[in-house]
Each structure stands twice: as C-alpha cells, then as structure tokens.
Amino acid sequence: MGLIRLQKILADAGIASRRASEQMILDGRVSVDGNQIFELGSKFDPEISKVEVDGEVISSKKSKIYLALNKPRGILSTLSDPEDRPHLGDLLQDRHERLFHVGRLDKESEGLLLLTNDGDLAHRATHPSFSLPKNYLLELRGMVSKEVVDAFRNGVELDDGMAKVDKLTVLPGQPGRTLFDVV
C-alpha cells in the first residue's frame, strides 16, 4: 500500500476527521508498533504497521459505507449538537461508524444527503476547488413573479459577496406553488 500520513490512516479507518486525528496524535493518544507518536506528518504503511488509539488496535481494512438519507425538515445537518437540537446523529443512533455528511441542507429544508466514511469522496464532493455542481428542487408557496425569477437569475448582494445561481429553471407546478430546478 505504501507510506501514508498517520492522520490519514486514522481518518480512513473512520476513527475521526483528519483534523481531529491530528489532535489525537498531538495529545499522545496514538501509537504505532508500540511507540507513542507525537509528530504530525509521520508516515507509515497501514498494511504492515500496528496502529493503536487509546490502546485499541485499529483496522486499516475498513469497508467504505455510503448511505443515502432523506433529511426531514426540522433536523440540523450535523452529526452532533451541543444544544441538543434534533440532528442527523439522532437518525443514525444504531450506526457506530464515523460518518461524514456530504453537503448540508438548512434546518427547514428536506432532501437527499449522502453520508459516508469515505473522507476522500466527501472532500471531492464538497470542496469548492472541485467545482462540483449542486442541484436543488426549490418549492415556494404561491405564484412567483417575473421580478423574483429575475432576481434569482441576476443574483443578490450578501454581506460576503454576490450570491447567484448558475442555472434556474421554472418547472410545472401545482396551483398555489412554484417549483424551480436550481443549480
């Protein structure tokens, strides 16, 4: 397999995110072949080296998990919440693997979310440098005027810059609501 940074080995095994894995290393919680590791960036071959976290051996042969979840309204797109509000973690209580949500939806939005322990996929799907388009079905109550549609297409100025859709298509709807396909 070759040499891999220790924090990536931990993240790939589903122990924690890379950042949290770095903190575990700095805290002295990680050993490789019986030697406590404190240095970030240390590389090992996970097929050969015995990696332990808090004295427990981790397996490098973790199978990848991909879950499709229909997030309901009223649920936060996070796996834990310090204020104990309803969140994705509540829906996954029986799952013990470390999962990442790929993207997020607002609390009052509903829709498909991908959850995985494949950190590389999650990174490629969400990091802006990969320019992966995101598609949304937007439902608004009432019939929307041409001015509102134009505002969506032209963008709006927010505190942190211009927010603009790449593509907006008005879809056939039902009386009393307007549907958009937004990219």
Task: Tell me the role of every PLM-derived stretch.
Residues 1-183:
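Basic, flexible Lys/Arg- and Gly-enriched helix-loop patches that mediate nucleic-acid binding at interfaces
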